[in-house]
Amino acid sequence: MRFDEAYSGKVFIKSHPSFEESEVVIYGMPMDWTVSYRPGSRFGPARIREVSIGLEEYSPYLDRELEEVKYFDAGDIPLPFGNAQRSLDMIEEYVSKLLDAGKFPLGLGGEHLVSWPIFKAMAKKYPDLAIIHMDAHTDLRESYEGEPLSHSTPIRKVCDLIGPENVYSFGIRSGMKEEFEWAKEVGMNLYKFDVLEPLKEVLPKLEGRPVYVTIDIDVLDPAHAPGTGTLEAGGITSKELLDSIVAIANSNINVVGADLVEVAPVYDHSDQTPVAASKFVREMLLGWVK
């Protein structure tokens, strides 16, 4: 990668030219094969990169600049269109290689099922892993219309993998009654409607533990993020999500990886959603990479 490409829109702004010298690797997962309503999130990673050239490199939230963190944008994993299982296998293999290389993986989706193979790779690396999950939806189904590979299932899958007591979901305002009942029955940490205040209460409990953070853009109210596949009224503001990212940055937890998913720019011709997403990525880079 040439230095001038760092401002081209082909990569996330200010991307470092060297994989070897970088602490963080940004990678895209352009998959929306299993969505239940509106496809289009496969175009999210590219558009987040394109609009990132409009970002300031300085964060007034964290008093840091992007040049202080070395991150490499590796582009998108070349996922086979329509083949969900092969796509998930490729994501798990890629993230495992990043972890073996000592990199902080920062993934861009794509539908939320792409987080499932990442969870598996992270759990192998960190046996005491905890998950912070911000979303409008529970994502606790075992299957959707009989299909276990669905974007409505990744949090149920990771609960089964690492134990529901190690999964913390915030901002939840939609799901089947059975999903909410299951979460309560098994002792999962599910916080409805809000993110920031319950997150502040949880963070001290996670100090010293490796934590993976997954953010579904639809945790935001559609007024703040219309470009997503499954809109859900009654969400949080972009400011609350920014404040939550900063709260994590100012805590003593050890964030070991993250993803931001379900940006579907085809439904947002003003680019409001990818512009917000690119700002969230900036704050993750500056706040979570210690």
Curated annotation (Swiss-Prot):
EC top class, as a word: hydrolase
Reaction equation(s) it catalyzes: agmatine + H2O = urea + putrescine
Protein name: Agmatinase
Entry similarity comment: Belongs to the arginase family. Agmatinase subfamily.
UniProt pathway annotation: Amine and polyamine biosynthesis; putrescine biosynthesis via agmatine pathway; putrescine from agmatine: step 1/1
PROSITE patterns: ARGINASE_1, ARGINASE_2
Domain of life: Bacteria
GO molecular function: agmatinase activity; metal ion binding
Listed GO biological process terms: putrescine biosynthetic process from arginine, via agmatine; spermidine biosynthetic process
Function: Catalyzes the formation of putrescine from agmatine.
Cofactors (names): Mn(2+)
Keyword Hydrolase: yes
CDD domains: Agmatinase-like_2
EC number: 3.5.3.11
UniProt entry keywords in alphabetical sequence: Hydrolase, Manganese, Metal-binding, Polyamine biosynthesis, Putrescine biosynthesis, Spermidine biosynthesis
Binding residues annotated for Mn(2+), in chain numbering: 112, 135, 137, 139, 216, 218
Gene designation per UniProt: speB
